[in-house]
Amino acid sequence: MLQTLYDYFWWERLWLPVNLTWADLEDRDGRVYAKASDLYITLPLALLFLIVRYFFELYVATPLAALLNIKEKTRLRAPPNATLEHFYLTSGKQPKQVEVELLSRQSGLSGRQVERWFRRRRNQDRPSLLKKFREASWRFTFYLIAFIAGMAVIVDKPWFYDMKKVWEGYPIQSTIPSQYWYYMIELSFYWSLLFSIASDVKRKDFKEQIIHHVATIILISFSWFANYIRAGTLIMALHDSSDYLLESAKMFNYAGWKNTCNNIFIVFAIVFIITRLVILPFWILHCTLVYPLELYPAFFGYYFFNSMMGVLQLLHIFWAYLILRMAHKFITGKLVEDERSDREETESSEGEEAAAGGGAKSRPLANGHPILNNNHRKND
C-alpha cells in the first residue's frame, strides 16, 4: 500500500512535462541536476538555525538592545487564582460583563478585581519589548544576508534580464553550487520559522503566517525537485528585497527612534508594493503561467506550482491592505499602532499606576513610542 502511494506520488506525469522522466534528470557528463533527496539536509540545518538564533539573540541582539536602552519592563503579575485561571485557559481571555459577575461570585472578588486580574494575566502573556527586538534583529540579519546572497546568485544570469530564458531547455537544466546552497539555506530558514512559530511573538495574522510559511516551504521544495530552480531563485530574491527593511523598521521602533522607523517604513511600503503587487504578478507570475505553455502542454506540476503562487499572492494583497491602511493613518496623523499589534493594556484602577510606576500617567507603550508597536508580517 505504502509503496503504491510512493510510486503514485513520484509518477512523472504529475511533476514533469509529457515524454520526460526522472531518468532525464540523472547526473551525467559532469552535469548535476536537482534531486528530492537533496532536501533532507534542510531539517538538520533548520535545527542548526535555531541553535545559531539562540546564541545570536543572547550574545548579539541582547547587548545591542542594552546599548539602545531597551530593557525588560516590570509587569504586575496576576495573583494565583484557580477559578480565574481555569476560565482564562478554557473559556477566554476577555470575559463579558455577565461572565465577570459570575466569576466575581465564584472567586469572592469584586468585579473590578476580576477585571484587573484578567488585564494583568493578559499582559503576562504578551511578549516584552526586548523579546520583540531580539526576534526582529535575528530576522533582519538573515533577510539582509539572504537578499545580498540571492542577488549575487542571479544577477549574472541571463534569465535575470530575459525571463523567457528561465524556461530555455527546461527541465534539462543543471544546477550549480550557489543555487544549491541558496535553496537549502532559504528552505532551512523557513523550516526554522515554522518550528519556532509557537514561541515567537504572536501577531493578529498568526494563521496567515502559518499559511505563508507552509506555502513557501511547499513552493521551494517543489521548485527544487521539479527543476523550477531558475524561477525559484528569482522569487526568493524578490521576497527578501523588502523583508529586511521591515525588520529594521521594527528594530528602530523598539529603540524609540521614531523618525528613523517611520522613514524606513515608508521605503519598505514602497518596495513591498512594487515587488509584491507589480513585479511578482506581472513579471514573475506571467513568466510561470504563460511561457511554459509555449514549450509543453499544461500538467499537474504546472497547476500545482502556480496555485501555490496564487496563495502567496493573496497573502501579499492582504498584507498590502494593512500596509496601505497604516500608511494612510500615518500620513493623516492618526496612526497609533501597527494594524497587527497586540497592544499592552494599562492599569486603570485607583492606586495601580502608583504601584506600577510611582504615580506616572498610563502609557500605551513601553519607551513611549506609539508608531508601529508591533511588526507588520509577512511573513511575512
UniProtKB/Swiss-Prot annotation:
Give the residue ranges for region: Disordered: 338-380
Lumenal topological domain ranges are 1-40
Report TM segments.
41-61, 140-160, 181-201, 209-229, 264-284, 304-324
User: Which residues have a glycan attached per UniProt?
Assistant: N19
| Activity regulation summary | Ceramide synthase activity is inhibited by sphingosine-1-phosphate.
Q: Which residue stretches does the UniProt record annotate as biased composition, category Acidic residues? A: 344-353
Sequence ranges assigned to domain TLC in this UniProt record:
131-332
Topology check: give the Cytoplasmic ranges: 325-380
Ranges for region Homeobox-like: 67-128
EC numbers: 2.3.1.24, 2.3.1.297
Entry's CDD domains? homeodomain (cd00086)
PTM statement from Swiss-Prot or TrEMBL: Acetylated. Deacetylation by SIRT3 increases enzyme activity and promotes mitochondrial ceramide accumulation. Phosphorylated at the C-terminus by CK2, leading to increase the ceramide synthase activity.
> Which Gene Ontology CC terms are recorded?
endoplasmic reticulum; endoplasmic reticulum membrane; membrane
- Pathway assigned in UniProt: Lipid metabolism; sphingolipid metabolism
Q: Which SMART domains match?
A: TLC
**Where in the cell is the protein located?**
Endoplasmic reticulum membrane
Q: Which reaction does it catalyse?
A: a very long-chain fatty acyl-CoA + a sphingoid base = an N-(very-long-chain fatty acyl)-sphingoid base + CoA + H(+); docosanoyl-CoA + sphinganine = N-docosanoylsphinganine + CoA + H(+); tetracosanoyl-CoA + sphinganine = N-tetracosanoylsphinganine + CoA + H(+); hexacosanoyl-CoA + sphinganine = N-hexacosanoylsphinganine + CoA + H(+)
Q: What does this protein do?
A: Ceramide synthase that catalyzes the transfer of the acyl chain from acyl-CoA to a sphingoid base, with high selectivity toward very-long-chain fatty acyl-CoA (chain length C22-C27). N-acylates sphinganine and sphingosine bases to form dihydroceramides and ceramides in de novo synthesis and salvage pathways, respectively. Plays a non-redundant role in the synthesis of ceramides with very-long-chain fatty acids in kidney, liver and brain. Regulates the abundance of myelin-specific sphingolipids galactosylceramide and sulfatide that affects myelin sheath architecture and motor neuron functions.
| Domain remark in the UniProt entry | The last loop motif confers selectivity toward behenoyl-CoA (docosanoyl-CoA; C22:0-CoA) and lignoceroyl-CoA (tetracosanoyl-CoA; C24:0-CoA) as acyl donors.
Oligomeric state and interaction partners are given as: Interacts with ATP6V0C, ASGR1, ASGR2 and SLC22A1/OCT1. Interacts with ELOV1, HSD17B12 and TECR. Interacts with NDUFS2. Interacts with PAQR4; the interaction regulates the stability and activity of CERS2 and is inhibited in presence of ceramides.
Q: What is the protein name for this chain? A: Ceramide synthase 2
